[in-house]
């Protein structure tokens, strides 16, 4: 069937900010869809609130709106652009829910807009648990025994029928949000209450437990002519009970017989037909009873998903691109497979001759109060994928790709006595505990009995533990070529072998090199080598023939960001992509190295050559040996590649851009202090300490309060503000790695200072300011968690000019070539330098979207020797509108975790708001972040003594908008003395009715709550913040945030929608 010619313009709804359950994979799918539809001549209109995405680059769509993804905003875009159709299946649950809202509110009918990719009925049938169950029964497939309910009484009645343990699944949510497994009535009531709040339809599925069953996924595509193929089968290492996003998964499925696979395959196709998915990809999840072989359907997603991205990267089949083509009428037989050079049709079912492992990356270290047990609610923040010829090789490569300090099956960090608990109630280290169990002489049968992990997987790990024991009992010289080759085939890294042999990694490498025991590289070709591939999409293994076939062109290698932990998110993938694209255009052959399957950087056509490998020294050096690049870029992937810089230089690798020595000069406290002294620039008083005694002495020299943190960090891990010697002593005794090589940094904390971020770019001769951003939250809140405005909304021009002068001076002094970020604090009109990062940082995408200057592209060209003048980049662009970046937090996923912001970064993503005023931009950023301010109600204020003066303006602003003001007694007295009419409210310990009751009763529209550093004050007010979080009431733990929201609320009835292209067009005309 040819493409539809009745459609001229198509609106794609993106997924919004990166949150747990919905990450970079939708940037990958959305970017593919934009490219596919534009190639076919359609006008593409895009809406997405996330500025850190590739899909929101102005070149990706004809018209791009970085606006909140809510039906009211999208209606304004539809009214302005008049698209013929909407494609909602590339934006995860966010986009599907928005599409259903548009339909339910009559917008689609009003503007005669068609849903393509999935019909409203297909979405509803797949997402509504009751309808889905009926559909499965109709085609003879079983589902777990379940009942859906809309009230707590209905839920209790349903639970009595299904028994304990009980699975609670809210409807129309992502990543299992709000759900869980209950083993008793108290847990059941708590999860149901949370689940009802999470479901937009206030609906729960109360389901029979199938804990311990094996879990499988089938990634399926289907077109309107009923052509269907299975792209990939995926098996979960973890049994049912762990969310598939958190589970270790392998592809293809390893423990199914052919007969079982064919049954599951046929069932998957039947599910798509019955649900009505006929223009795209879907993910169907099954559970299989390991004892009886009974198979049931768990759920399906009628859209591209996290598993779609994994299946695409695992096989090379571009699911999102093909799904976009089907949405406009193409059929499977009409499309060709790009990865085989279009030699094969897209209808050729992929087959693979390697094993793929996906492992999730967690961030529980950021949320110490969170429950780290893995359940049906997703908790991971990122993931890695590894490929190998054996599952053991694949497992071990995935472990070392996680960026958690592992180089294989390192011993788990918990006590021996916890083995049984860790196997029975899995946490983030459960695979290591399987290894630990084998080391402790558990039998495979015992481990299977406790963990329900399939015996075949256990046999693979048992064999690896036997190999480790054999290695550790010998010496390096005992390992001949055959023994080393066997170990490398099983995925053992040089570093892990070195640990087992008590030698250095270098010694192991030097044992391999003379006998030419090097990895070879094999292509991902979708056909298990049946057809030749023209794309260089490669993974390493230890076999005979290398199929990499490197060219003799001038090459630049870009090291990516890995699994995107908190502090190193999608922004760094954006920068990596923006290094590859301009360098390709400039004639270089680009080589990307990364291990994250969710990203655009690991799309096979982003760079000339893609190596899907862990970002470790060993793996990178082997690729360098194979490719012999002219230069390597370590500055765009965050701390992950930056940590390798010195070791790469020591091994003769040419790091282009800012030198490794200059990076060290900026990161090393003593060297950087000398740079600032030479330039006459100020820093807050600071010292370096290598142990507790030295820290206490030097802290007295500086004075309290202090910011303390380890050196060489990203995302502020282990960063705190301490107000006393006792607090510093406690910090030093926590598990923070402090030594001569890794000292702790002590900085005097500047109270009530304004923090400022500056991005700039240099070619080594000239420096251009990219943008100056004023933080909303005061200094002391991690810059990644603070809102920020470009241009600044209250800094004087004189201060901004001084910041420009200091930034350029530091860039010249450090010999900057490429990008640099500087963080300043301004206190009483005095500018202090906080830190300098001579690399790409998380603000680069935001600045680029706000100003139209493609900073990452410009910086990459500078590294390759192309001057700023040659690129036509000679002056700063200052917009005549405001752009506000706001952070998005995962607190709702971690009940009990306090929402107070501090120096340690905890946000997972970001959004951007654009407006004619700072208030409008800030308010839109809050909407994009999911905050919804009720038009009526009361504003609750409870602030510490030093914040009371500042909160007066906030109270007056909200009162002028018609809100009641209800402070706690101390704040109420202060506001009354300053002429405000308020109604005091009790704190929770002061008697009822109290603030907790008011929040539950829906009386409170917004909370502003600041507390002193005193632990008792934090503890006493914790219940207020938790209640606000549970009731989805906007809350601000800084007075600056509350004040900004009070300014923003003035604009709520006058919000416009602005395309990136029209904003950038205005800037070009001005400049």
UniProtKB/Swiss-Prot annotation:
Keywords: Amino-acid biosynthesis, Arginine biosynthesis, ATP-binding, Ligase, Magnesium, Manganese, Metal-binding, Nucleotide-binding, Pyrimidine biosynthesis, Repeat. Large subunit of the glutamine-dependent carbamoyl phosphate synthetase (CPSase). CPSase catalyzes the formation of carbamoyl phosphate from the ammonia moiety of glutamine, carbonate, and phosphate donated by ATP, constituting the first step of 2 biosynthetic pathways, one leading to arginine and/or urea and the other to pyrimidine nucleotides. It comes from the Bacteria. Binds 4 Mg(2+) or Mn(2+) ions per subunit. PROSITE patterns: ATP_GRASP (PS50975), CPSASE_1 (PS00866), CPSASE_2 (PS00867), MGS (PS51855). Disulfide bonds: none annotated. Mn(2+) 4 binds at residues 835, 837. This is Carbamoyl phosphate synthase large chain. The gene is carB. Its EC number is 6.3.4.16, 6.3.5.5. Residues 1-403 are annotated as: Carboxyphosphate synthetic domain. PANTHER family: CARBAMOYL-PHOSPHATE SYNTHASE [AMMONIA], MITOCHONDRIAL, CARBAMOYLTRANSFERASE FAMILY MEMBER. ATP 1 binds at residues 169, 175-176, 208, 210, 215, 241-243, 285, 299. Mn(2+) 3 binds at residues 823, 835. Mg(2+) 2 binds at residues 299, 301.
């Amino acid at each position: 069937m040819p493409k539809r010619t009745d459609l001229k313009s198509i609106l794609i709804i993106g997924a919004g900010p990166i949150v747990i359950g919905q990450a970079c994979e939708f940037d990958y799918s959305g970017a593919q869809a934009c490219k596919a539809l534009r190639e076919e001549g359609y006008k593409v209109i895009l809406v997405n609130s996330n500025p850190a995405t590739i899909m929101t680059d102005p070149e990706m769509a004809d018209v791009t709106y970085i606006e909140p993804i809510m039906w009211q905003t999208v209606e304004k875009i539809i009214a302005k652009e008049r698209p013929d159709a909407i494609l909602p299946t590339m934006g995860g649950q966010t986009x599907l829910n928005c599409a259903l809202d548009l339909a339910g509110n009559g917008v689609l009918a009003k503007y005669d807009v068609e849903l393509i990719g999935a019909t409203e009925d297909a979405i509803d049938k797949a997402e509504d648990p009751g309808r889905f169950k009926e559909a499965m029964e109709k085609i003879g497939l079983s589902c777990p025994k379940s009942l859906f309910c809309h009230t707590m009484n209905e839920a209790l009645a349903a639970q009595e029928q299904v028994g304990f343990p009980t699975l609670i699944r809210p409807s129309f949510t992502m990543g299992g949000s709000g759900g869980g497994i209950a083993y008793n009535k108290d847990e059941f009531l708590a999860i149901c209450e949370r689940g009802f709040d999470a479901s937009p339809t206030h609906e729960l599925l109360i389901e029979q437990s199938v804990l311990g069953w094996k879990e499988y996924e089938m990634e399926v595509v289907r077109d309107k002519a009923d052509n269907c193929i299975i792209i990939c089968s995926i098996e979960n290492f973890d049994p049912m009970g762990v969310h598939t996003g958190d589970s270790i998964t392998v592809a293809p499925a390893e423990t199914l017989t052919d007969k079982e696979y064919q049954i599951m395959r046929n069932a998957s196709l039947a599910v798509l037909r019955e649900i009505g998915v006929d223009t795209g990809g879907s993910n169907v999840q099954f559970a299989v009873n390991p004892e009886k072989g009974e198979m049931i359907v768990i759920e399906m997603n009628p859209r591209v998903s996290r598993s779609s991205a994994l299946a695409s990267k695992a096989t090379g089949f571009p699911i999102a691109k093909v799904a976009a083509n089907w949405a406009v009428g193409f059929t499977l037989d009409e499309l060709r497979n790009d990865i085989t050079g279009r030699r094969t049709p897209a209808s050729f079912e992929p087959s693979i001759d390697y094993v793929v492992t996906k492992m999730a990356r967690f961030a529980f270290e950021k949320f110490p109060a969170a429950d780290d047990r893995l359940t049906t609610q997703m908790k991971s923040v990122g993931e890695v994928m590894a490929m190998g010829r054996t599952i053991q090789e694949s497992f071990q490569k995935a472990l070392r790709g996680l960026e958690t300090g592992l180089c294989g099956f390192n011993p788990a960090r918990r006590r021996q006595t916890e083995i049984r608990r860790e196997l029975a109630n899995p946490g983030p280290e459960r695979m290591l505990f399987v290894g630990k169990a084998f080391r402790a002489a558990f039998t495979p049968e015992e481990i299977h009995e406790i963990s329900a992990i399939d015996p075949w997987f256990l046999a693979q790990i048992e064999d690896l533990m036997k190999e480790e024991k054999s290695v550790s009992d010998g010496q390096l010289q005992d390992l001949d070529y055959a023994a080393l080759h066997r170990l490398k085939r099983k995925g053992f890294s040089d570093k892990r072998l070195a640990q087992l042999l008590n030698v250095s990694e270098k010694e192991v490498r030097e044992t391999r090199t003379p006998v030419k025991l090097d990895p070879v590289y094999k292509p991902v070709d979708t056909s298990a080598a049946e057809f030749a591939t023209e794309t260089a999409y490669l993974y390493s293994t230890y076999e005979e023939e290398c199929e990499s076939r490197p060219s003799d062109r001038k090459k630049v290698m870009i090291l990516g960001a890995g699994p995107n932990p908190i502090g190193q998110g999608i922004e760094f993938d954006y920068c990596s992509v923006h290094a590859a694209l301009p360098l390709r255009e400039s004639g270089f052959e680009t080589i990307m190295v990364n291990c994250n399957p969710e990203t655009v950087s690991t799309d096979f056509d982003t760079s000339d050559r893609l190596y899907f490998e862990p970002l470790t020294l060993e793996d990178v050096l082997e690729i360098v040996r194979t490719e012999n690049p002219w230069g390597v870029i370590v500055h765009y992937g965050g701390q992950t590649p930056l940590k390798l810089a010195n070791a790469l230089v020591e091994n003769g690798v040419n790091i282009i851009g800012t030198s490794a020595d200059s990076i060290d000069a900026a990161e090393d406290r003593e060297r950087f202090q000398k740079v600032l002294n030479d330039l006459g620039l100020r820093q807050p008083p600071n010292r370096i300490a290598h142990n507790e005694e030295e820290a206490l002495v030097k802290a007295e020299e500086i004075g309290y309060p202090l910011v303390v943190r380890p050196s060489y960090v990203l995302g502020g891990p282990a960063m705190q503000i301490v107000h006393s010697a006792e607090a510093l002593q406690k910090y030093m005794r926590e598990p923070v790695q402090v030594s001569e090589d890794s000292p702790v940094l002590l900085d005097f904390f500047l109270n009530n200072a304004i923090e400022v971020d500056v991005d700039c770019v240099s070619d080594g001769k000239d420096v251009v300011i990219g943008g100056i951003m004023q933080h909303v939250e005061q200094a002391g809140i991690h810059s990644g968690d603070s809102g920020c405005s470009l241009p600044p909304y209250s800094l004087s021009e004189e201060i901004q000019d001084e910041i420009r002068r200091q930034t350029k001076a530091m860039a010249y002094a450090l010999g900057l070539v490429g990008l640099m970020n500087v963080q300043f604090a301004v206190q009483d009109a005095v500018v202090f330098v906080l830190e300098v990062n001579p690399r790409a940082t998380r603000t680069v995408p935001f600045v680029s979207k706000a100003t139209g200057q493609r900073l990452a592209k410009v910086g990459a060209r500078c590294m390759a020797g192309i001057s700023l003048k040659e690129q036509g980049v000679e002056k700063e662009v200052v917009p005549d509108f405001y752009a506000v970046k706001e952070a998005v937090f995962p607190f709702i996923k971690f009940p009990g975790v306090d929402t107070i912001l501090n120096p340690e970064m905890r946000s997972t993503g970001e959004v951007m708001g654009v407006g004619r005023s700072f208030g409008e931009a800030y308010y839109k950023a809050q909407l994009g972040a999911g905050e919804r301010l009720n038009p009526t109600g009361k504003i609750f204020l409870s602030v510490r003594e030093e914040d009371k003066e500042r909160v007066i303006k906030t109270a007056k602003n909200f009162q002028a908008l018609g809100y009641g003001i209800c402070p706690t007694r101390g704040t109420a007295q202060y506001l009354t003395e300053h002429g405000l009419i308020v109604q005091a409210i009790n704190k929770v310990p002061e008697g009822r009715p109290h603030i907790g009751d008011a929040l539950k009763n829906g009386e409170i529209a917004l909370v502003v709550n600041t507390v002193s550093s005193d632990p008792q004050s934090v503890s006493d007010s914790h219940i207020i913040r938790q209640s606000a979080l549970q009731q989805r009431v906007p809350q601000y733990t800084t007075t600056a945030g509350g004040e900004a929201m009070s300014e923003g609320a003035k604009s709520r009835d006058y919000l416009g929608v602005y395309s990136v292209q029209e904003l950038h067009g205005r800037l070009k005309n001005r400049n």
